[in-house]
Amino acid sequence: MGSDYVLSILVDKASGITVEDTAELTELISPLLDTISPDPFPDQYMLEVSSPGLERPLKTAESLKAAVGSYINVSLYRAIDKVKVFQGDLVAFDGDILTIDYLDKTRHKTVEIPYQAVAKARLAVKL
C-alpha cells in the first residue's frame, strides 16, 4: 500500500503558502509528472507538495533580505554583549549587517550583527 519513495517539492511565495495552494499545486504537478517519458520515477512514489514551514532556516543573504520585517532567531559564533542568541524583528539587512529589534526583559533594544558572525538564522514564531 505505502510507497518507499517520496518526491518532495517545496513551494513558497511572498504572501505565504496555504493548504489550498499546496492542494492545487499537487493537482497540477501530478498529471504533468505522469507525462514524462521515460518515466524518471519507475517505482511507486508519493508526491508531497509543502511549504518550507513557519520556522524555516534563512541560509543565504537573499533569504535574509526577503525576511526583513519578519520575526527571526539568530545564533552567533561569538557573543555580542554576552548574548549569543537574539530573537526579534529583523529591521534591516544590507548584505553585511543585520539590524534586529529585540526585547530585553521589558525594554526594546536594537543590535547590529555582522553577517559573518551569524552561525544560524531562521524565521521564528512570536508568542
Swiss-Prot record:
GO biological process: ribosomal small subunit assembly; translation
Main location: cytoplasm
UniProtKB keywords: Cytoplasm, Ribosome biogenesis
GO cellular component: cytosol
Compartments it resides in: Cytoplasm
Known function: Required for maturation of 30S ribosomal subunits.
Similarity-based family: Belongs to the RimP family.
NCBIfam families per UniProt: PRK00092.1-2 (NF000928)
Name the UniProt record assigns to this protein: Ribosome maturation factor RimP
Gene: rimP
